[in-house]
Amino acid sequence: MGFSNSDWGGAEGYKSFLESIIYYHGTIGWRSHKQKVVALSSVEAEYNALLESAQDLEWMKNLIFEATNKKVQQLLFTDNQSAISIASNHIYHHGTRHINFCLHFIRDLIEQQNLKIQYLDTNKMIADSLTKNNPYSKSIKHLRIIFSNQDL
């Protein structure tokens, strides 16, 4: 299970998108860094974060398969419905022409039923704690969820 998020300009001094990715339930991993590409929109930035998350989850899926011989579908949460729509919709739209076709790796994973992407309300997005200046109480709540493996 993974959580993917991005933020533009939320951190002092950054003028490019930050992304954060959290994986939990068993293996815990996270990272927060500036994106390697210049996104032309917030949707593209969210989609880039989804791409990196999907690649990591695919690696984890293969590791689980090698260790247990069980195939599992990975679940990835994002708080951007437009990014979900782009990932799930094969129809070309003029408004998304700037999104690089190599990013459609996510579509292939969805089509092969190796990945499911679900919307998660921004207030429940635990990856926000890595990209945004949240109130202390919200950050503590997110950390408790991450480290206790409790459900959202």
What feature does the model see in each segment?
Residues 2-43:
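RNase H-like nuclease fold core
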Residues 33-152:
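RNase H-like nuclease module associated with reverse transcription
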Residues 1-2, 105:
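A residue-level detector for conformationally permissive "hinge/kink" positions
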